[in-house]
Amino acid sequence: MNEKDNQTTSEPENEQEIIDVNDSGEQPEENETEQPQEEAVENDEIAKLQQEKDETYNRLVRLQAEFDNYKRRTLKEREADRKYKSQDLITELLPAIDNFERALQVEVTEENKSIIDGIMMVYRQLQEALTSQGVEPIKTEGEVFDPNLHHAVMQIEDENMDSNTVVEELQKGYQLKDRVIRPAMVKVNK
């Protein structure tokens, strides 16, 4: 009997061992339900961080584009300032040049020859200075009237001339490089 008692007592131990194995098998099921919840929370955090990263990147790209546009714009403005820096001074000098041209239209006599020669030298120096800065007179007589370059003061009818043609220049116009600083005052054929 002792052997039977030993056998019966050993059986429950095996059952407990089996139960223990089953008990340990149930715990992973609880962990499995916790893991998807943790993964869902982690995925939400990852999605939020990804969205923040994308927004920050887009903001950075926009700021970089704005900065590049700013650099280009300021460079163009500096170039324009450099190109036309002398425009104000030239505009102030044009009436003096007009007066020199009127003085040179006076009839030369023995008495005023030296004065006219002096005026001519100063006038040439002024013209050279203007040319060195990129100032050119606007072509007028015989040219087709261009409202961007010419200011029509008078109109005449001449059958020998083409219509809309500049007949006479009344006051010289000037351009600084590609910009008109004073349009030419002209008489135009109808």
Curated annotation (Swiss-Prot):
* Primary location group: cytoplasm
Q: Where is the composition biased (Acidic residues)?
A: 26-42
Please name the PROSITE patterns in this protein's record: GRPE
A GO molecular function annotation here is: protein-folding chaperone binding
For this protein, the record's CDD domains field holds: GrpE (cd00446)
Asked whether the UniProt record includes Transmembrane among its keywords, one would answer no
A single Gene Ontology CC term:
cytoplasm
> Keyword annotations for this protein?
Chaperone, Cytoplasm, Stress response
One of the GO BP terms on file: protein folding
Q: How does it assemble?
A: Homodimer.
Q: Per its database record, what is this protein's job?
A: Participates actively in the response to hyperosmotic and heat shock by preventing the aggregation of stress-denatured proteins, in association with DnaK and GrpE. It is the nucleotide exchange factor for DnaK and may function as a thermosensor. Unfolded proteins bind initially to DnaJ; upon interaction with the DnaJ-bound protein, DnaK hydrolyzes its bound ATP, resulting in the formation of a stable complex. GrpE releases ADP from DnaK; ATP binding to DnaK triggers the release of the substrate protein, thus completing the reaction cycle.
Family label: Belongs to the GrpE family.
PANTHER family recorded: GRPE PROTEIN (PTHR21237), GRPE PROTEIN HOMOLOG, MITOCHONDRIAL (PTHR21237:SF23)
Q: What is this protein called?
A: Protein GrpE
